[in-house]
UniProtKB/Swiss-Prot annotation:
<feature type="active site" description="Nucleophile">
    <location>
        <position position="82"/>
    </location>
</feature>
<feature type="domain" description="AB hydrolase-1">
    <location>
        <begin position="16"/>
        <end position="242"/>
    </location>
</feature>
<comment type="pathway">
    <text>Cofactor biosynthesis; biotin biosynthesis.</text>
</comment>
<feature type="binding site">
    <location>
        <begin position="82"/>
        <end position="83"/>
    </location>
    <ligand>
        <name>substrate</name>
    </ligand>
</feature>
<comment type="similarity">
    <text>Belongs to the AB hydrolase superfamily. Carboxylesterase BioH family.</text>
</comment>
<feature type="binding site">
    <location>
        <position position="22"/>
    </location>
    <ligand>
        <name>substrate</name>
    </ligand>
</feature>
<dbReference type="InterPro" id="IPR029058">
    <property type="entry name" value="AB_hydrolase_fold"/>
</dbReference>
<dbReference type="InterPro" id="IPR010076">
    <property type="entry name" value="BioH"/>
</dbReference>
<keyword id="KW-0963">Cytoplasm</keyword>
<dbReference type="GO" id="GO:0009102">
    <property type="term" value="P:biotin biosynthetic process"/>
</dbReference>
<dbReference type="Pfam" id="PF00561">
    <property type="entry name" value="Abhydrolase_1"/>
</dbReference>
<dbReference type="GO" id="GO:0090499">
    <property type="term" value="F:pimelyl-[acyl-carrier protein] methyl ester esterase activity"/>
</dbReference>
<dbReference type="InterPro" id="IPR000073">
    <property type="entry name" value="AB_hydrolase_1"/>
</dbReference>
<keyword id="KW-0378">Hydrolase</keyword>
<protein>
    <recommendedName>
        <fullName>Pimeloyl-[acyl-carrier protein] methyl ester esterase</fullName>
        <ecNumber>3.1.1.85</ecNumber>
    </recommendedName>
</protein>
<dbReference type="GO" id="GO:0005737">
    <property type="term" value="C:cytoplasm"/>
</dbReference>
<keyword id="KW-0093">Biotin biosynthesis</keyword>
Length: 258
């Protein structure tokens, strides 16, 4: 079986698995490792087809979650950013023995806008998918720029995201197209409604990809979960506001100690 790239570090007793988003790799977490490592045993994963886990083609959400869970510690906290939030959520649903708590960051159980549900317009995602075959690198850059739009450190944050992408071989177009298909089709709203493990949802007030209205809608639909909207942050709050973000994670872990 092909192994995913899985980097472990940290001095804490609590396992915390971090899953990156579309087009990126586990290097995106390096800006907060120093803040979290004294408190957790961190597991930084390159999702199938991304970063140093290149030997994979496009996968469905269920298959990706199953593959990631095969190398996972038992009873970890799972933190998933953007598309990684869908993967972490799917693992929590299908393999709860791996999970003691779930944190999603700038993520949505349904990324696509639907009737009475805010999200990315289907034609925008379809456009990105079409553009991948025309101008691969520029399409990825445009998507990264959207993630930092509106923050005080927007340009700096976008450069950091771009440097993370360029650290390693770019994912194949097939893998990126498969990821966009997950964002376009996944809908875990009903499945997560009955989720009973500790669950925190973190949003950026300025996020142009996951509207903050998602937070209030899910507060009503999922009253057993908690949400935080970070002021001044966009789609990557751990990059623009690393100290505040790390405190959120530490507080969540402390409140949900076993």
């Amino acid at each position: 079986m092909k192994q995913l790239y899985w980097y472990t570090c940290g001095e804490g007793d609590c396992d915390l698995v971090l899953l990156h988003g579309w087009g990126l790799n586990s290097g995106v977490w390096h800006c907060i490792i120093d803040r979290l490592a004294p408190h957790f045993r961190l597991h930084l994963v390159d999702l199938p087809g991304y970063g140093r886990s290149q030997d994979y083609g496009a996968m469905s959400l269920a298959d990706m979650a199953e593959r990631v869970a095969q190398q996972a510690p038992k009873q970890a906290l799972w933190l998933g950013w953007s598309m990684g939030g869908l993967v972490a959520s799917q693992i929590a649903l299908s393999q709860p023995e791996c999970v003691r708590g779930l944190i999603t960051v700038s993520s949505s159980p349904c990324f696509t806008a639907r009737d009475e549900w805010p999200g990315i317009k289907p034609e925008v995602l379809a456009g990105f998918q079409h553009q991948l075959s025309d101008d691969f690198h520029r399409t990825v850059e445009r998507f990264l720029a959207l993630q930092t739009l509106g923050t005080e450190s927007s340009r700096q944050d976008a450069r950091l995201l771009k440097s993370v992408v360029l650290q390693h071989q770019m994912p194949d177009v097939e893998v990126l197209t498969g990821g966009l298909a997950i964002l376009r089709t996944a809908d875990l709203r009903t499945a997560l409604a009955g989720f009973t493990l500790p669950f925190m949802r973190v949003y950026g007030h300025l996020d142009s990809l996951v509207p903050r209205k998602v937070a209030s809608l899910l507060d009503s639909a999922w009253p057993q979960t908690q949400s935080v909207v970070m002021q001044g942050a966009a789609h990557a709050p751990f990059i623009s506001h690393p100290n505040d973000f790390a405190k959120l994670i530490l507080n969540f872990a402390e409140e949900n100690k076993k």
